[in-house]
């Protein structure tokens, strides 16, 4: 009898272990690729500044894609290997979206790597079909392709003698944050990802986002929306973000975001494991100017803590005592503010360019 009870208990516990923590999809079937496929990188020196030098890179990815990318290295060579941050742009932008921050990050001792997502930048098709909207299979496949492209980017970075393969971070904004939740979820080589203004749950996004390409498709054809939800479920980041744990993840979101709605933000946060940090600023999809430096402070502190082991100040108010004087602070602000402002202006222009009605 005890043996039967023991067997029953074992089966019960086994059944419990297959509950919500069990992955809904097999990551290798969705985001797997041939790891021995040659990268065949092509590298061309590009621009240089006083702080950094840029190398144009293309490399082979899955499905015979060649991925255009930029490797940004500090101008002055360093003896130690560098931590590298992969930068992923938002919808409608390209690999130069974070360019205004390249100088500050390379001066802080980081290498950077940025790619064009599928159907963006150098990979943008001439017919300009919207990334999201009436073609859910196309959108799904593009997101999967971009995640694989990012995994191949890590493969490439691990071949570079300047890069520390154990200190690869990630910053993704908006669509780049959604992609990053999947990428970091299926690739353990990514440390401490930062997901900016990202969200999950495609149903919330399609029904409540102010992006016209989703809203109009949902309103004009409810059956089409249901089909889109079925197709896109495999690339819903809520299924993948929990796999980031036990690596830490930072979320930064606006409490009045109507592009990636707050309900969608919280769905992604709730699906993530621990440790995680959630930072809210007061504003929409683009932080208001009053919070720009605070957001940058959070990002900088997170990178320095988890990739360099030396935390810095949390926000712009915390820089004042560290800099030692008001004059030193204003000098720092004069250098930092233009780059920060330029970045968020470009981000805002990209976002609101997609808010206007467009042909589906």
Give residue spans per PLM region:
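Active-site glycine-rich loops that stabilize anionic/oxyanionic intermediates
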Residues: 62-63, 82, 87-93, 255
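Gly/Ser-rich "nucleophile elbow"/oxyanion-hole loop immediately N-terminal to the catalytic nucleophile
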Residues: 131-174
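Short beta-strand/loop motif that positions the catalytic acidic residue
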Residues: 244-245, 250-253, 257
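Acidic catalytic loop of the alpha/beta-hydrolase fold
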Residues: 255-260, 287
